[in-house]
């Protein structure tokens, strides 16, 4: 069976063969299989050495101190630790938190949990259509009792980039902690934590050709950020995250981050051309809309709404392409994407969206093929749509009164 063209890199990426090779060296008796917390023999020392080297590799990509990297099981855990950890530790200083309506569920759900614990959350509305959360919005929402602002650097559905450097200046001036979810940003945009005033940052390995099940939380040392641990046990990771370290996964994450640093700029340039080619081609169709900011974005995403076409039907028609409607974390529900709804899209347009996301194995031939089959599928589905016929006849659908069955 021929495999479909993979255009869902925002959901996950395959492990780079070089990363897999490094990981394999840490699994069997011949390799570095020891427990990094075993301080009394060489097996433990060797594992610890690999873990600390990987910590340096991750820190180097984001220009941080290796001692500021805390290993977790992924960005979801990192987000939970950052939000609940800071909120619970500093609750006596204030109970107000700012986030936005278009964050990942790994931020929104902990916020709901904190609301139940008595915290007050302000959910910022993004700019219509572009999805930008601006420094001005944050400035207007900051209060003396705001202890934390949590915003993503790159949105996982539309690829819009938030100006976290400018927002960091505002939060630092207000003596407010700033957490950034950078799961979709690492390896795609430059991150310099030696200059950015960001206190906590979440990462995941599987978004940049590393393994699933491993991530990290950057926790600033100066000015110091303290957290209330959410997982208790052996006191690993300076007490912030207990649990035996998975050496092979950590080594994989370190290797993936190092490789990303070497290829990032050239790869963004290459992918930008592919994205533009697909978007330019899709605009041959009528009633096609770009979701997200036209320029302030990363090249890896193209989120498009095809009016008068149901996104689920379109996905089913694109058997040769692996794409998603909404994000993979919420695509189990048939609800329209809450991110696109927050951008002001109608239910119909939100339902008709497809997210194409590109990566290092995407070729120009892939784009040509996907463009051809997408155009054909949209045209075929519109032929079946009575709404499309009405639109073509010049009927304003917003004025139509639908009879109840």
Curated annotation (Swiss-Prot):
Transmembrane segments: none annotated. It is found in: Cytoplasm. Its cofactor is pyridoxal 5'-phosphate. Keywords: 2Fe-2S, Cytoplasm, Iron, Iron-sulfur, Metal-binding, Pyridoxal phosphate, Transferase. PANTHER family: CYSTEINE DESULFURASE, CYSTEINE DESULFURYLASE FAMILY MEMBER. It comes from Acinetobacter baumannii (strain AYE). Pyridoxal 5'-phosphate binds at residues 75-76, 156, 184, 204-206, 244. This is Cysteine desulfurase IscS. It catalyses: (sulfur carrier)-H + L-cysteine = (sulfur carrier)-SH + L-alanine. The active site is at residue 329. Belongs to the class-V pyridoxal-phosphate-dependent aminotransferase family. NifS/IscS subfamily. Pathway: Cofactor biosynthesis; iron-sulfur cluster biosynthesis. Pfam families: Aminotran_5 (PF00266). [2Fe-2S] cluster binds at residue 329. It is an enzyme of class 2 (transferase). The keyword Transferase applies.
């Amino acid at each position: 069976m021929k495999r479909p063209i993979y255009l869902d890199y925002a959901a996950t990426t395959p492990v780079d063969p070089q990363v897999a090779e490094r990981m394999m060296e840490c699994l069997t008796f011949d390799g570095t299989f020891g427990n990094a917390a075993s301080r009394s023999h060489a097996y433990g020392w060797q594992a610890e050495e690999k873990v600390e080297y990987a910590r340096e590799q991750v820190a180097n990509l984001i220009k941080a101190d290796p001692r500021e990297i805390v290993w977790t099981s992924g960005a979801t855990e990192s987000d939970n630790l950052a939000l609940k950890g800071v909120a619970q530790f500093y609750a006596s200083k204030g109970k107000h938190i700012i986030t936005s309506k278009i964050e990942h569920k790994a931020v929104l759900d902990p916020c709901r949990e904190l609301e139940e614990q008595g915290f007050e959350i302000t959910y910022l509305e993004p700019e219509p259509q572009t999805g930008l959360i601006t420094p001005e919005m944050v400035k207007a929402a900051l209060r003396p009792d705001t202890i934390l602002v949590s915003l993503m650097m790159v949105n996982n559905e539309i690829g819009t980039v938030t100006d976290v450097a400018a927002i960091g200046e505002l939060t630092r001036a207000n003596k407010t902690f700033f957490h950034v979810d950078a799961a979709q940003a690492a390896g795609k945009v430059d991150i310099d934590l030696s200059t950015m005033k960001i206190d906590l940052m979440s990462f995941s390995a599987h978004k940049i050709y590393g393994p699933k099940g491993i991530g990290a939380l950057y926790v600033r040392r100066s000015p110091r950020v303290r957290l209330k641990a959410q997982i208790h046990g052996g006191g690993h990771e300076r007490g912030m995250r207990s649990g035996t370290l998975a050496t092979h996964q950590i080594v994989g994450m370190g290797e993936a981050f190092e490789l990303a640093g070497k290829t990032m700029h050239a790869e963004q340039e290459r992918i930008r051309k592919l994205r533009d080619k697909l978007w330019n081609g899709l605009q041959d169709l009528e009633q096609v809309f770009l979701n997200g900011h036209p320029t302030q974005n990363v090249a890896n995403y193209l989120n498009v709404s095809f009016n008068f076409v149901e996104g689920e039907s379109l996905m089913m028609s694109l058997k040769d392409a692996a794409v998603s409607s909404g994000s993979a974390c919420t695509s189990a529900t048939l609800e329209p994407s809450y991110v696109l709804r927050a951008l002001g899209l109608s239910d119909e347009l939100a339902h008709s969206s497809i997210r194409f996301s590109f990566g290092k194995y995407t070729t120009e031939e892939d784009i040509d093929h996907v463009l051809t089959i997408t155009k054909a599928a949209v045209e075929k589905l519109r032929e079946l749509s009575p709404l499309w016929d009405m639109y073509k006849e010049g009927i304003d659908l917003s004025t139509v009164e639908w009879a109840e069955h």
